[in-house]
A protein has these predicted regions:
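Conserved small/polar residues in nucleotide/adenosyl-binding loops
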Residues: 221-224
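Beta-strand/loop edge motif enriched in small/polar residues
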Residues: 68-73, 78-86, 102-105, 126-128, ...
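Short, T/G/N/S-enriched strand-turn elements that build extracellular solenoid repeat scaffolds
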Residues: 3-8, 23-31, 47-53, 107, ...
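Surface-exposed, flexible loop/turn segments at secondary-structure boundaries
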Residues: 69, 140, 182, 191
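Extracellular beta-helix/beta-solenoid repeat scaffolds
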Residues: 14-75, 86
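Intrinsically disordered, low-complexity terminal regions
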Residues: 1-14, 70, 218
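Detector for repetitive beta-architecture
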Residues: 13, 24, 34-36, 41, ...
Length: 224
């Protein structure tokens, strides 16, 4: 621990609980090290990202069953590369049966530079920018989400590599309020099942191609 930063530099499982104000958990492990963090009833607020993963093989973030966990940065977040409440430069998986509340006060709620997998859990995400800002690939399965973003709601976008920027959604109940795009993929967008409602946006669903294989309801509002 150094000043207001707790650094995780080795592989392992780390269980975190309780409240903190002004402390960042930073994951800076070797590229061969997988890091598993279990959130077990956490409320974390910080000037910059509450959790920031800058190096590791893969980071796993588990929401403990029955717990509510909250992460927030601040409007004065000075880290332009990690302008989110939760940031990962490496592949990130979020799973579990708990609840995660995210408040992105500087820009984004969750920002992932590589691939983001989300399996299970309930999510309430607000952001002054994008709720989800993912670079390469976004897969969301078996979740319940309420999203309120001033810009894009759920976004994966890669301007440099057209082979990525893909999104896969299955068995979710997701409600999005967005100032710009509700659900956006620069690559292929595939929806297999679930209910997706975009209450307010300039574009409800956007992708290089959009494939809807099933689902109870896929609805969106396109405002002009």
């Amino acid at each position: 621990m150094s000043d207001s930063t707790v650094t995780i530099s080795k592989s392992g499982t780390y269980v975190i609980s309780g409240q903190s104000d002004g402390i960042q958990i930073k994951i800076a492990a070797e590229k061969t090290d997988d890091v598993h963090i279990v959130l077990k009833g956490v409320t974390m607020t910080n000037t910059n990202a509450a959790i920031s993963a800058t190096s590791a093989g893969h980071v796993y973030l588990t929401l403990a069953d029955g717990t509510t966990n909250s992460l927030s940065d601040s409007a004065s977040n000075s880290d332009e590369k990690a302008d989110a409440a939760l940031f990962s430069k490496v592949d990130l998986t979020i799973n579990g049966k708990g609840t995660l509340n995210i408040d992105g006060k500087k820009n984004n709620g969750i920002k992932a530079n590589d691939t983001l997998h989300i399996t299970g859990g309930s999510y309430n995400i607000t952001a002054v920018g994008d709720a989800f800002n993912v670079n390469d690939e976004l897969n969301i399965t078996g979740t319940t989400m309420t999203i309120d973003a001033k810009e894009d709601g759920v976004k994966v976008d890669n301007d440099e590599d057209t082979s990525v920027g893909t999104m896969y959604l299955s068995d979710n109940t997701i409600t999005v309020t967005a100032g710009d795009d509700g659900i956006h993929a620069s690559g292929d967008l595939v929806i297999d099942s679930g209910t997706y409602t975009v209450k307010n946006s300039t574009e409800g669903l956007e992708g290089k191609s959009i494939t809807i294989n099933g689902g109870d309801t896929v609805s969106y509002t396109h405002l002009t």
